[in-house]
């Protein structure tokens, strides 16, 4: 037998070759096993279901001989295949010749039966040996005995397959001597990055592959690349990590000018080869490098360098390196990757809110989650760091060990940049090396963050900034990103841009942009602005009053962008404007004029709007804009929504490029000017709720119009000619509809109230319609069967049509996913027009039963039957809907039968823990329903909200307060779970719904007085009813490592204190009682090995704890965002 040293010196193509009988394990055990190997970056040979024959395929023989380890999965039918047995012969041969390692797995099979060829395995083996030579049989028997004598894994000795598979994978890592370094194992989210990178690296391939890691500064690219290097380096013959430190050290002993210097290139290559071959004194010459590494399987990481000369010198061509080599290039510049034909690119994205908070907590508390009294503060800090890993880490380390009061004092200062964060991000800005790109960066940071890309390009046109190229460069360098045609810049990068502008001058009026409230107020009040100011952006929600000098803008004659805005148009905050009567000047160079709640009746008389591109003045007090005709060739967008005093629109005959005109809720407007006929490029016209509008000029045909909203124009007497190619139309509550209306390309149509249909509805509609809304029309009595011609219809809303009795039968709208028939009070039959509906609203209809056929709606997620006063029964087949998330039967006062047999709980076994969710059921005011029976029959993945004033006797532990203390309880599993019930009293005379979260806090106390606190958020609830509510839910608390550290290493505790809280600060809500039933007392859980909220077989899986933690964080963040927005 070959020595282990000769084995380890071979250049293996694969780490593992699996030998198995596909009939038994391919789609079960083996698929999970191979997935775990992939997750750990262990390269396995995959046969891709090669057609099997009697002789061993050459490809399989190559796979066996080039694998470091052979894993033999012995199963019941393994010996039925001469193919498997011949594989085994080759494996034994490789074991003897060059020390191939072999790991046997006995899958539902006694090892002795394999070793001695007895039992059912022996019988199958004897059958296979028929018509075979004696020599073949003997060699097979010897191979079976040889491998079965090796210490392996017997599945019956393990509690579950998952644990065994993980142990085998770790065993393989150990045998391969490729156990990953522990340096990065505690990094939050690193495993997810490595898993995603593994598919790009495609390690099983023999090709030489270059892979890029791309993302903005501070997002964790270097951390990910170092973790990969640590994990992978020992799988390669050579490995080297190249960063700026490596380059600077290589240049220290050289006096040349730069990398273009040929000698410098050789010197850099010499340093590189010294790392590759682990030798100090290497002498090279022209072309030596590619020859020296040509047969070397190498891992090369080039981090944070976008210097073309460095890449050319060290990895100029993939042909330089041996088969299987991987070159990873880490950069902020996507263009650099493209230019070097690196097509496999991993984009590093910001972590989720939950992961960001976990990152911060690791830095601040050295734990995964914050102490309860720091939860909200920690969430706010993470929010202000914008989820950027660098910011989270720096802020966490700075706040570690500091008292809560200091945290509170520090929060206002977190809007600025920490020195380390600022320096890191500044490198990205300085790396632009182009003044135009730098200028675009500052424009976005100060003015345009969150604006539409198309608007930004128009506003910066003619600016000599080469905006198209500049935006592409900023995207490539991860300084901005584009989502849904909206441009976004990270909050810390935005703060960097603002800080750069602040350093331009100590005098705010001498700066390029004004972005701070104090500076803006000072400049506008004291008239200190100069020609250097290009833009002003002010959120009026930040101030209560604003003084504007009559000559404030005269010194700023280069002002291009004036943005005085509010994000809270729905809130009527009053700002005291001090605008002098003689205020008569705005710079004529303005391209963007946004002035929400403008306080005057018209714009300054000396303002010339010829350069305007975008005019937005929502909720203004304007009565008119200006007099006369102006050249408005550049104007693309005019938005005057909510300007209720506006009486006239100026002459727009020269606004020939206007694309969007929004006049919604301009309730004093009586007519449109005849000049709109010249708006040949108008695409979007919104005149909704112009309730005094009477006429639209006749003969107007806006051929480019795509969206038209005339909803609520109740006095409209004449209609414009609607183009046939329009795609979106809302004519609800209008006085009339023209009889010649034909809508060939219509995608969405909204009709309601006083609409009089002069022609049958279906003749008006395009078969490509995807959404139809038809509401509040008492004359509508039936839906015609011809609706089936709308084969692309996805959303159908027929609401409050109180004389609608039936829907057509025998049709199936395949595309329909949402159906709303609410308040159709005469509708008695359950709809049967589509089997693909996911959202069904039948509230306040006359339906009497949920039929057996409900099971056909296999994709149903939401069912609303609130207020169905005739509803008598709900079919038990509803429990077969495996996607159902919420069902509301509140105020179904005649409902007597609602059976939930729990048969769908079998489905839950198949769901991943992270995707697992409860079914929320609402039975408030169902007075004839046996609520006690309903609670007792509740399956373990549901929540209930019911009517009630006290906790039912079903719950063995009850109290009229908000907390319960339990004495010592013996626990056999690594979790604590129970069914909880709270009595919530709603005292409100508002018609608005009341929502609330329930928080359950458990304090586990051991016999020494040590305690550990854990919190669960069982759900979010909503109600519109007064009085008492019973809320029933299931809670789950895992006993993780942190828990056992506190409680003497065992699942033992003296008692548990359980407190129920309402997290909402709402005086309308009171918690008046609570109760619990321990999980072992829940009938539906008798045979469950896990908690009510957890899947069988995975009760120790950390994913469950993460799921609970993410739920908690999501709810906390929602409340926090609401609080921040209301400031």
Swiss-Prot record:
Select a single GO molecular function from the record's annotations and give it: NAD+ nucleosidase activity, cyclic ADP-ribose generating
Sequence ranges assigned to domain TIR in this UniProt record: 12-176
Q: Which reaction does it catalyse?
A: NAD(+) + H2O = ADP-D-ribose + nicotinamide + H(+)
Q: Which residues carry this modification: N-acetylmethionine?
A: 1
Q: Which InterPro entries match?
A: Apaf_helical, Disease_R_plants, Leu-rich_rpt_3, LRR_dom_sf, NB-ARC, P-loop_NTPase, TIR_dom, Toll_tir_struct_dom_sf
Please provide the record's keywords in A-Z order.
Acetylation, Hydrolase, Leucine-rich repeat, NAD, Plant defense, Repeat
According to the UniProt entry, what is the EC number of this protein?
3.2.2.6
What SUPFAM superfamilies does the record point to?
L domain-like, P-loop containing nucleoside triphosphate hydrolases, Toll/Interleukin receptor TIR domain, Winged helix' DNA-binding domain
Q: Which residues are catalytic?
A: 87
Q: Name one GO biological process term.
A: defense response
Q: What class of enzyme is it?
A: hydrolase
Repeat (LRR) positions are: 197-221, 540-563, 587-609, 610-632, 633-656, 658-679, 680-704, 766-790, 791-813, 814-834, 835-857
Give any Pfam family that matches: LRR_3
- Asked if the keyword NAD belongs to this entry, the reply reads yes
According to its UniProt record, in which tissues is this protein expressed?
A: Ubiquitous.
Instruction: Spell out the subunit comment.
Output: Interacts with EDS1.
Beyond the main fields, what else does the record say? Ecotype cv. Columbia does not respond with a hypersensitive response to hopA1.
Q: What is known of its domains?
A: The TIR domain mediates NAD(+) hydrolase (NADase) activity. Self-association of TIR domains is required for NADase activity.
Function text: Disease resistance (R) protein that specifically recognizes the hopA1 type III effector avirulence protein from Pseudomonas syringae. Resistance proteins guard the plant against pathogens that contain an appropriate avirulence protein via an indirect interaction with this avirulence protein. That triggers a defense system including the hypersensitive response, which restricts the pathogen growth.
The protein's name = Disease resistance protein RPS6
